[in-house]
């Protein structure tokens, strides 16, 4: 069992007296910046001109272009989309790094796959909250927190680990617990979870179930309720108490069907396909494909997105959600 670090575990405040630059002021950026500021740390924001620039100023921060923020800071947290981090780092951050600066990430993609290669005299570590930015901020304000992972990749200063834990405590994560990992483990497991289960696996499972019912002559609206709408109810039960809690909470009919039909859907072949997905991630095949498509203006990405937008389940869902005012609809119109 891995060690979990809590507030009382972090006795040295290695972040005190250092200037922290948060690069990016999106979902994670605003949460990290505001939590650190509320805990008394010296925080500046580095972003390009735009709406986020104005928002950060309105929130009371000193806001600078990325290169100037990097030049001023001792600790630089990069909270930009994966696909633009490499260019921003090369053009605006790297020229302004000094020995014993700390370069920090919330996801290991660009370090692990070599897109960003920091100089050897710079600390490199990761602090990755396991939740979206709005939840990181809201739970902090309520006195609780979202758990996080941390990892150290380079430690020329000898204090990267202390800095990582101090940063995690600064954003509130040690209230809930912080687990140590590596850039390799965080990156590969995160990508696998997204592709095989949370996003890719779940969406294809739901779509296939919907299509099976509709093709068999059932009403699309009924199919939507059975395979998508009720998904949240089941996931919430697992989230709150694991699979045992879910099975305890459903009917005996549903539980029996779980046992006898689940293995018919998720067969050994499906697990073999999952292993192939993991292998692609580990070998860098997925990252190469993503990076090359980014360099090609995301031609494949945009094509795939457009194909999925037109699926019948989306149109049916938009109509049904209009019937349920208790759902805060977030339909994406194009």
Swiss-Prot record:
Binding, substrate: 251
Cofactor(s) required, per the database record: Mg(2+)
Coiled coil feature spans: none
EC number: 1.1.1.86
Cofactor-binding details, from the entry: Binds 2 magnesium ions per subunit.
GO MF, one annotated term: magnesium ion binding
Pathway where it operates: Amino-acid biosynthesis; L-isoleucine biosynthesis; L-isoleucine from 2-oxobutanoate: step 2/4; Amino-acid biosynthesis; L-valine biosynthesis; L-valine from pyruvate: step 2/4
Residues reported to bind NADP(+): 25-28, 48, 52, 82-85, 133
GO CC terms of this entry: cytosol
Catalytic EC class: oxidoreductase
Binding site residues for Mg(2+) 1: 190, 194
KARI C-terminal knotted domain sequence ranges: 182-327
Catalytic reaction annotation: (2R)-2,3-dihydroxy-3-methylbutanoate + NADP(+) = (2S)-2-acetolactate + NADPH + H(+); (2R,3R)-2,3-dihydroxy-3-methylpentanoate + NADP(+) = (S)-2-ethyl-2-hydroxy-3-oxobutanoate + NADPH + H(+)
InterPro entries hit by this protein: 6-PGluconate_DH-like_C_sf, KARI, KARI_C, KARI_N, KARI_prok, NAD(P)-bd_dom_sf
Keyword list, A-Z: Amino-acid biosynthesis, Branched-chain amino acid biosynthesis, Magnesium, Metal-binding, NADP, Oxidoreductase
Residue intervals of the KARI N-terminal Rossmann domain: 1-181
Active-site residues (renumbered): 107
Binding site for Mg(2+) 2: 190, 226, 230
GO BP: isoleucine biosynthetic process; L-valine biosynthetic process
Function, in words: Involved in the biosynthesis of branched-chain amino acids (BCAA). Catalyzes an alkyl-migration followed by a ketol-acid reduction of (S)-2-acetolactate (S2AL) to yield (R)-2,3-dihydroxy-isovalerate. In the isomerase reaction, S2AL is rearranged via a Mg-dependent methyl migration to produce 3-hydroxy-3-methyl-2-ketobutyrate (HMKB). In the reductase reaction, this 2-ketoacid undergoes a metal-dependent reduction by NADPH to yield (R)-2,3-dihydroxy-isovalerate.
Entry's family note: Belongs to the ketol-acid reductoisomerase family.
Protein name: Ketol-acid reductoisomerase (NADP(+))
Protein source organism: Staphylococcus saprophyticus subsp. saprophyticus (strain ATCC 15305 / DSM 20229 / NCIMB 8711 / NCTC 7292 / S-41)
């Amino acid at each position: 069992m891995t060690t979990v670090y809590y507030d009382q575990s972090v006795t040295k405040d290695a972040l005190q007296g250092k200037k922290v630059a948060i690069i990016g002021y999106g979902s994670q950026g605003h949460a990290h910046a505001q939590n650190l500021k509320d805990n008394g740390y010296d925080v500046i924001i580095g972003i390009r001109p735009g709406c986020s620039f104005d928002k950060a100023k309105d929130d009371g921060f000193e806001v600078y272009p990325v290169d100037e923020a990097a030049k001023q800071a001792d600790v630089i947290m990069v909270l930009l989309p994966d696909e633009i981090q490499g260019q921003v780092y090369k053009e605006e951050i790297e020229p302004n790094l000094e020995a014993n600066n700390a370069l920090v990430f919330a996801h290991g993609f660009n370090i692990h796959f070599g897109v960003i290669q920091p100089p050897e005299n710079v600390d490199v570590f990761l602090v990755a909250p396991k939740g979206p930015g709005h939840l990181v901020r809201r739970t902090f304000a309520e006195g609780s927190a979202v758990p996080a992972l941390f990892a150290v990749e380079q430690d020329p200063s000898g204090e990267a680990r202390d800095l990582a834990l101090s940063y995690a405590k600064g954003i509130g994560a040690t209230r809930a617990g912080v687990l140590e990992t590596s850039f390799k483990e965080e990156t590969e497991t995160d990508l696998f979870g997204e592709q095989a289960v949370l996003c890719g696996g779940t969406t294809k499972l739901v779509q296939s179930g919907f299509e099976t019912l509709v093709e068999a002559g059932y009403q699309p609206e009924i199919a939507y309720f059975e395979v998508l709408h009720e998904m949240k109810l089941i996931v919430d039960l697992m989230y709150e108490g694991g699979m045992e809690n879910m099975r305890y909470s459903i009917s005996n009919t549903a539980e029996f069907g779980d046992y006898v039909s689940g293995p018919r859907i998720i067969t050994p072949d499906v697990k073999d396909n999952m292993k192939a997905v993991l292998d692609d991630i580990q070998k860098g095949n997925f990252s190469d494909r993503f990076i090359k498509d980014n360099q090609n203006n995301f031609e494949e990405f945009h094509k795939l997105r457009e194909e999925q937008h037109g699926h019948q389940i989306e149109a049916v869902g938009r109509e049904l959600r209009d019937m349920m005012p208790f759902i805060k609809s977030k339909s994406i119109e194009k």
